[in-house]
């Protein structure tokens, strides 16, 4: 997605503040779970932490438009396509998980057998709310901020690491915690790939995938009760599906790029190389603007020179015309004076001849 860039200092500080506030609020809210009276598998109040952290960062830092660029509620064909994928991928993951249980264990353990004393609609509403609060903070806000400086793939890795640290569960030992970390990391990577190139329309896709995954776990697996085999199956199934999905996505984009002869930016507006050429583009634009200004100055200077030369030539031609007119006047006056003198001489001769003839007549 293309947005106005925030400064590097604000970028790093925003990520740091978001992480610290999220972790601190999670520790604080965890102590209030029992007092609220809602079971954790229905609604975990620690999921409010990333939502509150995002609100705090939006209020505390400038460039509000850039910070909210990842939260758009409009829907287009690409969003619908990704929502369908967000429903299909959890189904594939849990089909692999159930096949693994049937192959490597006697049967999969249902959480319903021990602790499902809440109506299904209540669980659905609770998981939708948890998904919204968590994904608003991590995907619609944090992923958008991280993508402001790095490309989508590495942004998904950074957000995935932060998300996995926030969701870490060390209650049931280190092996369980390791598989849980792998699961949450690949969970986040898949969402990052699903929301790629959606131009900020992320919340629907992330919410559907998150709610589908968490809702199915309540009924099919008992990883939340500390069952290591359940956690291992979920983690490995999610990792397998995530790797295949990312590879297929890369292959499809590469095929589209080759068959249409378009640039990667045209094929995928927010692709892996999206932010790599921004500095070069900025530099080239600045260079072009400077060249344009220089050419404008040069053209204006040339035009002024031409105008000055034209004025000078015009004045010279006018001077030449005036001088030629003066010469013509002088020649004309000279000719008139000469003509008048000749006429006077002729008149004098005629008068003399008349006088001579009159004298002869008298004699």
UniProtKB/Swiss-Prot annotation:
Keyword Secreted tagged: yes
Q: How does it sit in the membrane?
A: Multi-pass membrane protein
Instruction: Tell me the compartments it is located in.
Output: Cell membrane; Secreted, Cell wall; Cell septum
Transmembrane feature ranges:
9-29, 41-61, 83-103, 118-138, 153-173, 175-195, 202-222, 232-252
Give GO terms: molecular function aspect only: endopeptidase activity
Q: Which organism is it from?
A: Staphylococcus haemolyticus (strain JCSC1435)
One GO CC term, this protein: plasma membrane
A Gene Ontology biological process annotation? CAAX-box protein maturation
Q: Does the keyword Membrane apply?
A: yes
Q: Function of this protein?
A: Involved in bacterial cell envelope homeostasis. Regulates peptidoglycan processing, perhaps acting as a scaffold protein.
A single Pfam family, by name?
Rce1-like
Comp. bias regions, Basic and acidic residues: 287-315, 324-363
Q: What is this protein called?
A: Lysostaphin resistance protein A
Q: What keywords are assigned to this protein?
A: Cell membrane, Cell wall, Membrane, Secreted, Transmembrane, Transmembrane helix
Disordered: annotated segments: 269-363
Task: Identify its protein family.
Answer: Belongs to the LyrA family.
């Amino acid at each position: 997605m293309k947005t106005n860039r925030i400064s590097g200092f604000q970028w790093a500080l925003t990520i740091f503040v978001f992480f610290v506030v999220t972790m601190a609020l999670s520790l604080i809210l965890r102590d209030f779970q029992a007092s609220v009276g809602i079971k954790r598998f229905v609604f975990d109040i620690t999921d409010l932490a990333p939502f509150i952290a995002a609100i705090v960062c939006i209020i505390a830092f400038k460039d509000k438009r850039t910070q909210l660029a990842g939260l758009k509620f409009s829907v287009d064909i690409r969003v619908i396509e990704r929502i369908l994928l967000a429903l299909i991928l959890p189904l594939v993951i849990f089909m692999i998980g159930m096949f693994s249980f049937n192959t490597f264990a006697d049967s999969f353990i249902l959480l319903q057998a021990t602790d499902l004393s809440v109506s299904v609609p209540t669980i659905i509403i609770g998981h939708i709310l948890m998904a919204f609060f968590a994904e608003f903070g991590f995907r619609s806000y944090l992923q958008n901020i991280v993508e402001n400086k790095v490309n989508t793939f590495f942004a998904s890795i950074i957000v995935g690491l932060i998300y996995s640290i926030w969701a870490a569960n060390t209650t049931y030992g280190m092996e369980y915690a390791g598989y849980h970390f792998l699961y949450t990391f690949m969970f986040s990577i898949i969402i990052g790939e699903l929301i790629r190139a959606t131009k900020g329309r992320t919340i629907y896709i992330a919410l559907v995938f998150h709610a589908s995954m968490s809702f199915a776990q309540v009924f099919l697996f008992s990883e939340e009760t500390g069952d290591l085999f359940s956690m291992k199956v979920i983690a490995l199934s999610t990792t397998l599906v995530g790797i295949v999905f990312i590879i297929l996505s890369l292959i499809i984009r590469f095929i589209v790029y080759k068959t249409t002869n378009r640039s990667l930016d045209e094929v995928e507006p927010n692709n892996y190389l999206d932010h790599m050429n921004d500095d070069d583009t900025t530099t080239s634009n600045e260079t072009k603007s400077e060249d344009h200004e220089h050419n404008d100055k040069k053209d204006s200077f040339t035009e002024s020179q031409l105008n000055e030369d034209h004025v000078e030539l015009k004045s010279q031609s006018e001077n030449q015309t005036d001088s030629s007119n003066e010469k013509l006047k002088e020649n004309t006056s000279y000719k008139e004076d000469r003509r008048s003198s000749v006429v006077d001489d002729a008149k004098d001769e005629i008068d003399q001849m008349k006088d001579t003839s009159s004298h002869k007549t008298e004699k």
